[in-house]
């Protein structure tokens, strides 16, 4: 696996692979990789002949007071994990390489509606930063397909909409969330949790599983079901950001008629913000 730091080197390597008839897969990350990321790379390697991963901690998607400066940078360990997972090329640019004109005047990509509620409400500008950097990376790599984790469900919905609306010829694959044995969704931010907090954190997935089972059993009183789970999460000591039952594609509030449903939660455990979701396809 080669590591390149400039767009010119990236494009040369991808052009060489494509000229050999290879299908290009892409997995964008912010580094500090765990086995969930490795699953995304493995999926790309199954679907493509040449896999590019990127590591870039994108300042545009961090708001004031968020963890940009303390976000872990673990390049050497990440390179080893990518190699083991089947990555062929790592693109690890600097901020200056990604935003050579600075960020103030940078052209932005905005996906309205899908970006506005849920995480978008408490992290204004976040999804604009995500859409902007992903569109830049897509233009740099020009992959045939890209893999994203379903743990960041709203992000996946935003990227699918952007690719559709801007006619990008890229297949987007959503890969199921990888979980610890106790159900906690793997996340780079789990490393911020104390041992005590880590023991509490699986309450989020328990709540999702309970409300999901109730909905599958035919209970469509979403307000009542939500209130029960909110009470359980707050009783465990988390500070809730949101707990919502939404339609699975457009993320509008779900109705009893919907067959494609996603339940999404975000909550703070101490200073650490955790997110999770459960996607349901009803018969």
From Swiss-Prot:
Could you give a GO molecular-function term held by this entry?
A: ATP binding
**Active-site residues (renumbered):** 37 (proton donor)
Q: A single Pfam family, by name?
A: Pantoate_ligase
Q: In which pathway does it act?
A: Cofactor biosynthesis; (R)-pantothenate biosynthesis; (R)-pantothenate from (R)-pantoate and beta-alanine: step 1/1
Quote the record's binding site residues for (R)-pantoate. Answer: 61, 155
GO terms under cellular component: cytosol
InterPro entries associated with the record: Cyt_trans-like, Pantoate_ligase, Pantoate_ligase_C, Rossmann-like_a/b/a_fold
Instruction: Name the keywords, alphabetized.
Output: ATP-binding, Cytoplasm, Ligase, Nucleotide-binding, Pantothenate biosynthesis
Task: Cite the SUPFAM superfamilies for this sequence.
Answer: Nucleotidylyl transferase
Chief localisation class: cytoplasm
Q: Which GO terms describe its biological process?
A: pantothenate biosynthetic process
Residue positions annotated to bind ATP are 30-37, 149-152, 178, 186-189
Q: Where in the cell is it found?
A: Cytoplasm
Q: Provide the family line.
A: Belongs to the pantothenate synthetase family.
The record's subunit annotation is: Homodimer.
**PANTHER family according to UniProt:** CYTIDYLATE KINASE/PANTOATE-BETA-ALANINE LIGASE, PANTOATE--BETA-ALANINE LIGASE
Q: What does this protein do?
A: Catalyzes the condensation of pantoate with beta-alanine in an ATP-dependent reaction via a pantoyl-adenylate intermediate.
Protein name in the entry: Pantothenate synthetase
The protein's organism comes out as Pseudomonas fluorescens (strain SBW25)
Lineage of the native species? Bacteria, Pseudomonadati, Pseudomonadota, Gammaproteobacteria, Pseudomonadales
């Amino acid at each position: 696996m080669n590591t390149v730091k400039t767009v010119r080197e990236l494009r040369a390597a991808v052009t060489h692979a494509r000229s050999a008839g290879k299908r290009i897969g892409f997995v964008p990350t912010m580094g500090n990789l765990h086995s969930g990321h490795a699953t995304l790379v493995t999926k790309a390697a199954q679907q493509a002949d040449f896999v590019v991963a990127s590591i870039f901690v994108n300042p545009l998607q961090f708001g004031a007071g968020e963890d940009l400066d303390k976000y872990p940078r673990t390049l050497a360990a990440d390179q080893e994990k990518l190699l083991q997972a089947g990555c062929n090329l790592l693109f690890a640019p600097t901020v200056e390489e990604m935003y050579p004109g600075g960020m103030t005047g940078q052209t932005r990509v905005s996906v309205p509606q899908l970006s506005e509620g849920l995480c978008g409400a408490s992290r204004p500008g976040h999804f604009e930063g995500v859409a902007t950097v992903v569109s830049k990376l897509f233009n740099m790599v020009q992959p045939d397909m890209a893999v994203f984790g379903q743990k960041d469900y709203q992000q996946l919905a935003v990227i699918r909409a952007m690719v559709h609306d801007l006619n990008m010829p890229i297949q987007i694959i959503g890969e199921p969330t990888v979980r610890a044995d106790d159900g906690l969704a793997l996340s780079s931010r789990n490393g911020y949790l104390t041992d005590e907090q880590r023991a509490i954190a699986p309450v989020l997935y328990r709540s999702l599983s309970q409300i999901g089972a109730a909905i599958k059993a035919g209970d469509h009183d979403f307000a009542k079901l939500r209130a029960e789970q909110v009470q359980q999460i707050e009783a465990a000591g988390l500070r809730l950001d949101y707990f919502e039952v939404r339609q699975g594609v457009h993320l509008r509030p779900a109705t009893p008629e919907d067959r494609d449903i996603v339940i999404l939660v975000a909550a703070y455990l101490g200073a650490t913000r955790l997110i999770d979701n459960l996607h349901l396809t009803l018969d």
